[in-house]
């Protein structure tokens, strides 16, 4: 016969705080992904430090509880695609009050705001954005994220680095010391329970070591002509700024070059690129040709992974269209990837996005259209998502 012992008074309660923290982090990550378009397209994001804070709305975590139903008939069934926390309703459900649709009578969700820094934002999206694989080039100089190696032990650390064997050894050593002390005092040491204590815990000490990778250069090219109004320019700068911040996190010493153009192209500093404005006509070819010259002078394709990215509203002087197409074909031959981002394009004329996609068949040519601010995040993912990694 089975014997059941009541040990409830001796049980250690489960730490619910750990589970709540995990669920809170999931809500934060979900909310960040849902609001990324608005955050990344903020004009104020450009030029901000890593400690710049952004507010994110998050639904509160409710405790599980049984509640009375509405005595409605039928059985609620799911579709198989539900996620944890989703409600399965039977029949139609009255909508909650929404703007311009009258007042509702349903209980709403509790929403509060939390703040994250720009640096934390980059950390959240780093799992989804990945630079295409860097080919092994000659004379590697770029240092990527450091890799950690175990170098000894320490008394404080995080749980994943807990050294279990060393912890047990520390406990045994303490137990033996106490055993000797009790024997000297003439006490019975066998009756004493001997649980683990905080002082027994040992953690691996991890030393970060830099890891070398292949050379990589990002060349940012922006149309600064008169057709690029302030909204388009802010959107382009936000696009490039987030891209540069992410890549600087992933590759510590990655090289960046900045070019902006009207009918003529100029190489500028990072500060000028993100803050200076010009006006004039548009020769798209001028920016591409300047990038090709830059590559010839400083970045041999045999030694460097080259990623030019160009942003424009797609308007170009018609006599320059053929030269622009030929320039893009040429730069594709010497680059690992060439990205073309078209911002808030005109709906009245056929833009360069359609001309490029019709005439350019190179596999390393990637084009995206940003028709509104919320498209910015999807454009970034398309340009750099993991599926674009080269074989």
UniProtKB/Swiss-Prot annotation:
Region (Disordered): 1-23, 75-107
InterPro entries: Spore_YhbH, UPF0229, vWFA_dom_sf
UniProt-listed SUPFAM superfamilies: vWA-like (SSF53300)
Composition skew (Basic and acidic residues), residue ranges: 80-92
Domain of life: Bacteria
Family listed: Belongs to the UPF0229 family.
Entries under PANTHER family matching the protein: UPF0229 PROTEIN YEAH
Protein name, as recorded: UPF0229 protein CLL_A3091
Source organism per UniProt: Clostridium botulinum (strain Eklund 17B / Type B)
């Amino acid at each position: 016969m089975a014997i059941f012992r009541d040990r409830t008074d001796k049980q250690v309660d489960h730490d619910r705080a750990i589970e709540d923290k995990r669920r809170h982090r999931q809500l934060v990550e979900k909310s960040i992904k849902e609001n990324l378009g608005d955050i990344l397209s903020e004009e104020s994001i450009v030029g901000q430090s890593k400690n710049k804070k952004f507010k994110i709305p998050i639904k509160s975590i409710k405790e599980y509880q049984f509640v009375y139903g509405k005595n409605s008939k039928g059985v609620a069934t799911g579709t198989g695609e539900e996620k944890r926390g989703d409600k399965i309703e039977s029949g139609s459900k009255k909508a909650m009050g929404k703007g311009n649709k009258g007042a509702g009578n349903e209980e709403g969700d509790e929403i509060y705001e939390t703040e994250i820094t720009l640096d934390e934002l980059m950390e959240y999206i780093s799992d989804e954005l990945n630079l295409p694989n860097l080919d092994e080039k000659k004379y590697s100089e770029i240092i990527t994220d450091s890799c950690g190696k175990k170098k000894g032990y320490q008394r404080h650390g995080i749980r994943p680095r807990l050294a279990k064997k060393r912890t047990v050894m520390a406990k045994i050593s303490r137990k033996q010391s106490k055993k000797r002390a009790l024997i000297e005092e003439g006490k019975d040491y066998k009756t004493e329970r001997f649980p683990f204590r905080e002082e027994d815990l040992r953690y691996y000490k991890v030393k970060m070591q830099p890891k070398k990778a292949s050379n990589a250069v990002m060349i940012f090219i922006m149309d600064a002509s008169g057709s690029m109004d302030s909204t388009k320019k802010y959107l382009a700068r936000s696009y490039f700024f987030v891209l540069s911040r992410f890549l600087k996190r992933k590759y510590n010493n990655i090289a960046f070059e900045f070019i902006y153009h009207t009918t003529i192209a100029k190489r500028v500093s990072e500060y000028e690129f993100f803050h200076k404005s010009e006006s004039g006509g548009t020769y798209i070819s001028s920016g591409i040709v300047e990038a090709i010259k830059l590559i010839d002078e400083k970045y041999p394709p045999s030694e460097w992974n080259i990623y030019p990215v160009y942003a424009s509203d797609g308007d170009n002087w018609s006599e320059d269209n053929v030269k622009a197409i030929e320039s893009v074909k040429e730069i594709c031959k010497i680059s690992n990837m060439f990205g073309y981002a078209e911002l808030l394009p005109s709906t009245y004329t056929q833009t360069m996005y359609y001309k490029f996609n019709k005439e350019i068949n190179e596999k390393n040519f990637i084009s995206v259209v940003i028709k509104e601010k919320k498209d910015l995040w999807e454009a970034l993912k398309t340009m750099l998502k993991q599926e674009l990694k080269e074989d």
